[in-house]
Amino acid sequence: MAARMCCQLDPARDVLCLRPVGAESRGRPLPGPLGALPPSSASAVPADHGSHLSLRGLPVCSFSSAGPCALRFTSARRMETTVNAPWSLPTVLHKRTIGLSGRSMTWIEEYIKDCVFKDWEELGEEIRLKVFVLGGCRHKLVCSPAPCNFFTSA
């Protein structure tokens, strides 16, 4: 079973923050808009370790009681084809990081809700999950020298 995470949109940094949700929670972790986090999720995972979570490839900060650094993520299956989305998500996010125009944050939020959570939670495809780290996280490199590669295998 995949670990459950809540998303919170931080408009100041233009990133999605993920926080682990305790095993006692039920239902999808996105009951409302991405900006709304249930108050109980902030320290749901103990700071000591995250060995009970089944995700691999997450930085150590993912298991802190304060939650992980800013992460973006997508499922590998959706990344490997251009049929399922009008734009390539890495291209859109890369353009945003270097100041070029890209799709709105709303499009990215919808992409994540429709594609990632369906594959990750409902189908249990955490093996194919990849993690995108955007800025501010010192636990994992954002990209290699050139060409830029945002993704690390799960």
Swiss-Prot record:
Free-text description of this protein's post-translational modifications in UniProt: A fraction may be phosphorylated in insect cells and HepG2 cells, a human hepatoblastoma cell line. Phosphorylated in vitro by host protein kinase C or mitogen-activated protein kinase. N-acetylated in insect cells.
GO aspect biological process, one term: symbiont-mediated arrest of host cell cycle during G2/M transition
Chief location: host cell
Region span, Mitochondrial targeting sequence: 68-117
Keyword flag Transmembrane helix: no
GO cellular component: host cell mitochondrion; host cell nucleus
Domain of life assignment: Viruses
Pfam families xrefs: X
Subcellular location: Host cytoplasm; Host nucleus; Host mitochondrion
Keyword field: Activation of host NF-kappa-B by virus, Activator, Apoptosis, Host cytoplasm, Host G2/M cell cycle arrest by virus, Host mitochondrion, Host nucleus, Host-virus interaction, Modulation of host cell cycle by virus, Transcription, Transcription regulation
Keyword flag ATP-binding: no
Subunit structure as annotated in this protein's UniProt entry: May form homodimer. May interact with host CEBPA, CFLAR, CREB1, DDB1, E4F1, HBXIP, HSPD1/HSP60, NFKBIA, POLR2E and SMAD4. Interacts with host SMC5-SMC6 complex and induces its degradation. Interacts with host TRPC4AP; leading to prevent ubiquitination of TRPC4AP. Interacts with host PLSCR1; this interaction promotes ubiquitination and degradation of HBx and impairs HBx-mediated cell proliferation.
Family listed: Belongs to the orthohepadnavirus protein X family.
Function: Multifunctional protein that plays a role in silencing host antiviral defenses and promoting viral transcription. Does not seem to be essential for HBV infection. May be directly involved in development of cirrhosis and liver cancer (hepatocellular carcinoma). Most of cytosolic activities involve modulation of cytosolic calcium. The effect on apoptosis is controversial depending on the cell types in which the studies have been conducted. May induce apoptosis by localizing in mitochondria and causing loss of mitochondrial membrane potential.
UniProt-recorded name of the protein: Protein X
Organism: Hepatitis B virus genotype F2 (isolate Argentina/sa16/2000)
Taxonomic lineage of the native organism: Viruses, Riboviria, Pararnavirae, Artverviricota, Revtraviricetes
